[in-house]
Amino acid sequence: ATTQCFIRTAQHPIHRRYCTKQQQFRYNCLNTWFYLDTMFVSTRSVRGYTCGQVFVNDTGFSRVYPMKSKSMAGKALSDLFSDVGVPTSLHTDGAKEMTIGHWKEVREKHGGIKQTTVEPYSPWQNRAEAEIRELKKQVTRIMDNSGAPKRLWDYCLEYVSELRSRTALGLPKLNGRTPYEFVTGETPDISEWTEFSFYQPVWYYNSSEFPEPRGVLGRWLGVSHRVGQALCYWILPESAEPISRTTVQAVSSDDLVTTKVQDLIIKYDKSVSDRLARGDNDITEDECIPT
């Protein structure tokens, strides 16, 4: 199958250059709508995020971009175009950060993408509202079961969104495919998500001097897409400042029952908890309130 995104005709003598600014053709063109909304939280994340922009379509594909402020919605839209592609249409609420300013500039720069908005006080008209509820539900369950600190919600949110998009659903429209494949046309490679689960204890390589051990205890936070190459992961070390590493191994079930490793994990968890508890991490109403 083929497609044709534009056509150029020549009926008159040349008097000026053709337009060379075709920003919308730098990225994949997606044959889908995206519904979107801003997700608000009560705790500032370890990376300083206070909210997140959620994009979802009608087949269950979702993409989340944590943000330090709701005013960064335009950057999240630009990142979506770069990471996934440019959709045919957008459907939002009437918030200013999703209709004017940087948002409008990004939308017009990529071909003037059609945008519609919901009727005021009618959140049921936006699929992103239901997706946010599902994301919150799954993030809460995973963080409770794993014992992860609340300030790691942004890593868990991205992890859940990526898993949902790569899980085949029972929707007739998908015909047995994953939402990711339906939207992008590519079969998703799940290699980076099969070996570890969120906040799982792991050993990661540390280039320390002799006689310090090279394998150091940490916890797995997700895939680090913008650092290194494939199979590079976010790891939470004892310093509570996430790092990216490729050389990572799960702590084996045999090691987990030994007194030595159990003591290491207790010491690690206390150190992380103490470090993440420092400072005021609650979000004030002036920082990130919905409009």
Place the predicted regions along the sequence by residue.
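Retroviral integrase
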Residues: 1-137, 181-291
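Surface-exposed, charged/polar loop-rich segments
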Residues: 112, 117-173
